[in-house]
């Protein structure tokens, strides 16, 4: 695992697999994008280092955000992103059962440019949250069935069949995502966004 510096990470990779220091390392696919995100985080006075083989940004010793590189995208991950107000809904949980962290995914420099104003707002919030010393306490996990899902099933039998063919964990990931919105209109939009994954047999945010 690379534990030297963020510059070494961008040059050689994370060192967590056999592709370290080779063109096959996923980090090398996203160097330009990661550099833009890195500069954005440093611009607001965060301290930079490596944790778990990836760039980590802190304030007063508290973790604020990390950068990550994957096959299909790169991400900025907020450690307690669930505590932030995401008016533009650009954050997603990194996994179906994630209760604290939230990530923003990018697949190009242009996409970063489009989302950057909203990302900056999230970064400022994350810094303020870290400085406050507060610890985010997630709501108890309650699987509340969203009525908007039933409404869609009533008019789309194929979608209903596909959903009920999913594993319980994948079903739950969609339920939690949809039901997590407070407004009915937002829940309806989330149902629509989940349709392609449901039909493909995937859970929410599953790659």
Predicted regions, residues:
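Charge-dense, helix-prone N-terminal extensions
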Residues: 1-207
């Amino acid at each position: 695992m690379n534990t030297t510096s963020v510059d070494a990470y961008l040059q050689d990779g994370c060192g967590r697999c056999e592709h370290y220091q080779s063109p096959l390392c996923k980090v090398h696919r996203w160097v330009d994008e990661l550099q833009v995100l890195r500069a954005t985080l440093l611009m607001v006075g965060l301290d930079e280092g490596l944790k778990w083989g990836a760039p980590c940004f802190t304030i007063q010793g508290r973790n604020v955000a990390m950068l990550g590189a994957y096959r299909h995208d790169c991400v900025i991950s907020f450690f307690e992103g669930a505590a932030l107000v995401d008016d533009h809904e650009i954050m997603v949980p990194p996994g179906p059962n994630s209760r604290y962290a939230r990530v923003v995914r990018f697949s190009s420099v242009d996409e970063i440019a489009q989302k950057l104003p909203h990302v900056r707002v999230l970064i400022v919030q994350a810094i303020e949250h870290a400085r406050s010393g507060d610890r985010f306490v997630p709501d108890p996990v309650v699987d509340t069935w969203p009525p908007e899902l039933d409404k869609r099933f009533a008019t789309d039998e194929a979608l209903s069949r596909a959903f009920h063919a999913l594993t319980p964990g994948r079903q739950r990931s969609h339920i939690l995502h949809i039901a997590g919105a407070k407004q009915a209109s937002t829940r309806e939009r989330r149902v629509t966004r989940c349709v392609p994954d449901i039909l493909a047999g995937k859970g929410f945010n599953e790659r």
